[in-house]
A protein has these predicted regions:
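N-terminal loops that bind phosphate or other acidic moieties
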Residues: 1, 5-31, 37-43, 52-187
Length: 187
C-alpha cells in the first residue's frame, strides 16, 4: 500500500497550520494532526503539524507545518509554513477587502516569503486556498471576533527565485495557488 504519504498542495499545509494555531489560541491542547475539510465536502484530510504555541501572554499563537508535496522538483517541497493567529474584536464597520473577496471575519496577511501581486501588493492566493482557510477557520471563530491570519514562509523569498513568478507579476515569495488538495504526480 502507498500508505497515505500526506502529499498535499501548499494551501492545505497553510490551512492546517492556521487551524492548529487557532485551536491553540482557543485553549485546546496541541494535536500533531489537524483534520482539514475540503470545499466540496467530499472528504477531509489528516495533515501533520510540527509544532504550535501561544505567544505574547496568550494573545497570539503560532503553528508550523512542513509542506510535503510529493513532487521532487516542486519548489514547495519541504517548505516550512508558519501561521500566526490573533483574535480581534469586530467593530461596527467590518471592512471588506476589495480585491480578493475576503470575508469580514478573516483578516489575511501575506507575511515574509508569501507572494504578492506587484501591481497591488495584494496576497497572491487562489480561490481554493481562500476557501480552505474559510471552511476550516470559520467554525473556530469566537463570536464577535475576526481572525487575523499571517502566513510566513521563512524560505519563500529564496525559493521564489527558482520560479517564474516574477514573469507573472508575483513578487516577494511563493504564491498560494493550487486548485486541489492532493499533489498530482504527473507521469
Amino acid at each position: 500500500s502507498s500508505n497515505d504519504l500526506n502529499e498535499f498542495t501548499l494551501p492545505v499545509w497553510v490551512a492546517a497550520a492556521a487551524k492548529s494555531a487557532t485551536n491553540i489560541l482557543n485553549g485546546h491542547k496541541f494535536k500533531d494532526i489537524e483534520v482539514i475539510d475540503l470545499p466540496n465536502k467530499e472528504k477531509s484530510l489528516s495533515v501533520p503539524i510540527s509544532s504550535s504555541s501561544l505567544l505574547d501572554n496568550g494573545k497570539k499563537s503560532l503553528a508550523v507545518s512542513h509542506c510535503k508535496s510529493g513532487l521532487s522538483l516542486d519548489v514547495t517541497r519541504g517548505l516550512e509554513v508558519w501561521a500566526y493567529i490573533q483574535f480581534n474584536k469586530i467593530t461596527g464597520h467590518p471592512q471588506k477587502t476589495v480585491q480578493n473577496d475576503f470575508p469580514d471575519w478573516l483578516d489575511f496577511h501575506a507575511g515574509y516569503g508569501v507572494g504578492k501581486f506587484e501591481s497591488s501588493g495584494e496576497p497572491c492566493l487562489s480561490k481554493f486556498a481562500l476557501d480552505l482557510l474559510c471552511i476550516n477557520l470559520y467554525p473556530l471563530r469566537p463570536k464577535g471576533f475576526a481572525i487575523k491570519v499571517e502566513i510566513i514562509f521563512p524560505e519563500g523569498k529564496d525559493r521564489a527565485l527558482r520560479t517564474s513568478n516574477e514573469a507573472f507579476g508575483v513578487v516577494d515569495g511563493l504564491s498560494l495557488i493550487g486548485t486541489q488538495a492532493e499533489a498530482q504526480i504527473s507521469a
